[in-house]
């Protein structure tokens, strides 16, 4: 069994968008796709990015590329009807009081800032590019055909997800896998609506994994 087959998702000592159970399911999807070039929309604190880069390194050694797009600390610039994570709204309110003390008082570090995420991914700095800004602007200027896998987990409004998928699904290569998070999230029903419409309009293969991850690929 290879090292990548044995790879286990780690939450590290940060705030993770994916907890261990769903994180492992996600990295198993990455293993199945076996990508070299990876795009993530919605980096948050970089935990998923770090796991992806660790896995890409096992698969490709130093020959891989990760691109992450996020508003980072400028999340307040999102469109007015956007769904913002409670963790950001409450100014890094950790459930773990020790984490709160260390990050908010001792280090004074905003985990979703570009600087913090860059430091967290420094191990792979030659393979990683982080772009700060609105995905609606950045995607249209990005060559999406280079990516083998795209993880969509940024804005959760219908408008944002639909716009992102309109660009992505029309510009990816044939064997690219697009995975959208939070397909069944009740607090953001616009995600499911946008995905369902995009699948119908583009006639893509579609399946939902673990009642959470919507997987799209060309027929």
Question: Predicted segments — roles?
Answer:
Residues 1-219:
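A short alpha-helical cap/connector motif
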